[in-house]
Amino acid sequence: MFLVNLLILIIPVLLAVAFLTLLERKILGYMQFRKGPNIVGAHGLLQPIADAVKLFTKEPLRPLTSSIYMFILAPILALSLALTIWIPLPMPLPLIDLNLGLLFVLSVSGLSVYSILWSGWASNSKYALTGALRAVAQTISYEVTLAIILLSIMLINGSFTLTTLNLTQEYMWLIVPTWPLMLMWFISTLAETNRAPFDLTEGESELVSGFNVEYAAGPFAMFFLAEYANIIIMNALTVILFFGTYHLIFLPEMSTTTFMIKTMLLTSLFLWIRASYPRFRYDQLMHLLWKNFLPITLVTCLWYIMLPTTLSGLPPQM
């Protein structure tokens, strides 16, 4: 039965990822005054299926000098981790209700660094290795801010369980008292998922395509799916943390629908940002985190530690 539930979770995620690529191309198209994909199917709706067929029917080429096992394992690991993070998410009920759900999400997202590092190192290409090292440095750096923001939210929530956040936000979304944290969290998720304007790992002008430059066909598609699955998961997590997942007084049955609408709106904002802003310089990227975000998040975390004691209030309990 658990396997059936797992499949019911994974298949819609993969479908959502496939159609997110179409949504991105459509949004970028309309923002650049063109139509985007409109040939395959009505209004280009079958384009993701055509792309998948094309990629998975091509021959997966491998450089002769590459490390074969790591080269093959890296995309499999990337996609597996991207799908694993969905397990503790309450939508409105999680697949497994973990006591330390947020810690699990943070740990698994941290492991995705290894897939990037392996792919860059195993490709035996200077462009891939440079892109991988950039990606690893960027991901590890921004995870520091994400962890401190999560700790601040957990101090308000009183538990590491994700389902408790629904009770915490029953009367007011957490974005209202913690909007500076939300802004820093959103920018950090952009950097964590290597999206524009933080897509330095895939700088076409300098690194050809970044850490996945030597990949083609199926393995490339797996990296692609992992990247877009991470975008959706980060936005779903943003909704759970700051926008109250399923509390809808008049229509409690519409909980999953409202959750997905909020996630889709935030994901569209990711794509809008890609179309609007140029790429950061690498030193600016690191300066933003270590000299701006880190001190602010540490101060706010200390503030939330002192707040319950100062006001003699207790965090909500299950």
From Swiss-Prot:
Check the record and name the Pfam families matching this protein: NADHdh
Topology relative to the membrane: Multi-pass membrane protein
Look at the named UniProt entry and state the broad enzyme category this protein falls under. translocase
Which keywords does this chain's UniProt record carry? Electron transport, Membrane, Mitochondrion, Mitochondrion inner membrane, NAD, Respiratory chain, Translocase, Transmembrane, Transmembrane helix, Transport, Ubiquinone
Bilayer-spanning residue ranges? 2-22, 68-88, 100-120, 144-164, 171-191, 231-251, 253-273, 293-313
Reaction(s) the record says it catalyses: a ubiquinone + NADH + 5 H(+)(in) = a ubiquinol + NAD(+) + 4 H(+)(out)
GO CC aspect terms: mitochondrial inner membrane; respiratory chain complex I
**A GO molecular function for this record?**
NADH dehydrogenase (ubiquinone) activity
What is its subcellular localisation?
Answer: Mitochondrion inner membrane
User: Has keyword Transmembrane helix?
Assistant: yes
Its Enzyme Commission number? 7.1.1.2
Q: Name one GO biological process term.
A: mitochondrial electron transport, NADH to ubiquinone
Family membership: Belongs to the complex I subunit 1 family.
Function comment: Core subunit of the mitochondrial membrane respiratory chain NADH dehydrogenase (Complex I) that is believed to belong to the minimal assembly required for catalysis. Complex I functions in the transfer of electrons from NADH to the respiratory chain. The immediate electron acceptor for the enzyme is believed to be ubiquinone.
Q: What is the protein named?
A: NADH-ubiquinone oxidoreductase chain 1
Q: Which organism is it from?
A: Ornithorhynchus anatinus
